[in-house]
Amino acid sequence: MLVVAFASLLGAARAIMMPIDDPTTSDKFQITYANESLWDTLVMKNKTALESGELFDLGPDTKCFLPNMTRLHEQNVQSVNDPEYKQKLIDTLDMGAHIIDASLKNQCLVSQNGFWTYRYCGSGDFTQYHGVAPDPNDKLTYTLGRSSKQIENREFQLLYDDYGYYISEIIESGDICDVTGTPRAIEIQYTCGNVMRPGTLQWTRETKICHYEAQVIVPDLCQLELLSKNQDKKNAVPIICHMSNDVPDKHNIVDIVSNYDVSFVANQVYFLLPMNNSNVDRALLMYTGNATEDGLEMDPFPMEIYKKFIDVMNKMLGLGLLSPPDGKPFDVHDSYQWIGDIVDMHGNYLNRLRLDVDVNMEATLIIDKSINFTGPNNFQWYFRGSDRTKNSKSRFGSLTNDNMMLAGGSIINVDDISKENAQELLEKLVAAGKLSGVIEDNKITQGSPIEASKTKVTKASESTPVSEKNKKAKTVTKTIIRSRDKEEYFKENEKQGEENNAQVPFSAHNNEQHGTISKSERKEENTNQKQLANTQKGDTDTPPQSSQSSANDKLSRSGMGQKEPGVDEIGSELRGNSKKALGSNIDNSSGRSTLNDNSDRIAVENEAREIINSNAYDQSEASVDPNYRNDQQRLNSAKEHTFSQSKEKKSINSEEILETKILNSETLGNNDGVASDVKDEEVVESDRNGVIDDEL
């Protein structure tokens, strides 16, 4: 079983679709079965009927007679010239305008169509926006037209098309169009239809630049005879059919059409809504394609099948074909589960479809024959968003690490789908450039510190593209090695460092992004740092702030005031190596150290300063140029120096560790002080356990 989730089904993330003709305004047909005697009398031996209609086959054993629709339209056009009929048109327009005003006054109709959402408030504005609600200050909110509040100032017209009469109103004074420089305008077509009061906004489309059309169905307009064409009992065209035997086959398409209101949706799929007088209570989805060749009966199903039915469900919701069980319009935060059977043209069962929509308008589509279906109608359950309380529980069930995936920044329920199938599904749904990041993120334990760091770096990298040469310096990794492998590990790193230095010279960095600093400036800064260190040996309680200010001045002049993604992680590595150079012995029960003796503090600080100013690690260059911090050769030299120091000095007081943090805060330009450094960076080394846990 495959599960397809498509985000924001009722909102902005849904694929853009063009509106199709409203199924409630299309032609209706009423099919009547006739035995052979009645068939001969009404059709086969009726010359007038044969001249005004046509015969056609509806299956191998069924013949039907359809009246000529063109002649019916011609008769309607000819009747317009009648004076009495003209007066009837005038009266219909006048009464229709008052019905529209009364029905939609203080009411707002909303419909979603792809990226955009449309809202029309009677005697008010017609708005196009993106999001949950229109915001006048948002750049993605446009007013397509402004209607007058007084009915006397509104202009209505009674027009006619292939589907019959409708009332048209053009409202103007919309927002200025960026292309034409003129106000936007929209034509609203009011029609009769069997929908819930006060009405529905069926569709909205842009016919030309900044000119729009919309269709609004007002059920009370069906009170007017000329506008009631869409009522089945008044406009259904009678079709007479005769079968070779007198007992209709329940699996024949004629039987399906006679019990359901059929509406074409998309992709060879029809929506079958039970008629009021039928003995069925569940809607169906009829697939008219070849189910075997198209893979509808396969398990698992081809992705093309899911794409077809995702489009189908989008259009069904956009056209309002699905109605809540209480008969009220959908609310923005309603959640429900809708289940419908998929049948072929003969009514044979093919498969079962389930649509889950949660309160965040996220939808999940499942096609599976094993879906349990026990409800009296198509809704297995339904929760009103307005009735939901903070303590109410969702019927979706709990999300665990085994049945959730990260896709587009949202966690979705994939109904216990296996991770292998989920990954295969994502490969088809997620863009190739994002798939690797999605899969990689899920390899890390949920909620771990390293995951948070990696997510932070990844997001920064997305906003600022990172070249292939700089990726190593911008990635957070986690390495755990045994003590017996230390020498082999660092030798391998040294070899890798030489390869990296050969492939990625410092000159290859993007100077426009990182800024530059000349060798003379580095030399001058180096001298200033050493002089400042010598002058402060007598007073080690005060951190050398002036060296940092000098470095910041040069960074500001060279355009390096902002840190690039990953610099904090590289700085963490350098600070860790400085601690190793002094050795460490941290209380494993707490992972923290305290400072008790001021004399030890001074001694440790002086010793650390001498090590950092030695040839093993030139801190002045590392503090000036962030790229220089990634020099693998200097990093390996510091690591080699670590082992030589650790052999001479097996342990050190926890006070000395804290002093190392203070020193690193000064040399690496960390102005946050000791407290923040202790809180953010903790490196634990235990020679007794032989494990190093290091974040690079």
From Swiss-Prot:
GO MF annotations, alphabetized: carbohydrate binding
Keyword Endoplasmic reticulum recorded: yes
Binding-site list for a mannooligosaccharide derivative: W116, Q128, D178, R184, E206, Y212
CDD domains for the chain: Yos9_DD
Location of the region described as Disordered in the Swiss-Prot/TrEMBL record: 450-600, 667-696
Domain MRH: 106-224
Residues the record marks as carrying a glycan: N35, N46, N68, N276, N290, N372, N588
Cross-referenced InterPro entries: Man6P_isomerase_rcpt-bd_dom_sf, MRH_dom, OS-9-like, OS9-like_dom, Yos9_DD
Entries under PANTHER family matching the protein: ENDOPLASMIC RETICULUM LECTIN 1, OS-9-RELATED
Assembly with partners or alone: Interacts with missfolded ER lumenal proteins.
Similarity annotation: Belongs to the OS-9 family.
Protein name: Protein OS-9 homolog
Organism: Candida glabrata (strain ATCC 2001 / BCRC 20586 / JCM 3761 / NBRC 0622 / NRRL Y-65 / CBS 138) (Yeast)
Name of the gene encoding the protein in the UniProt record: YOS9
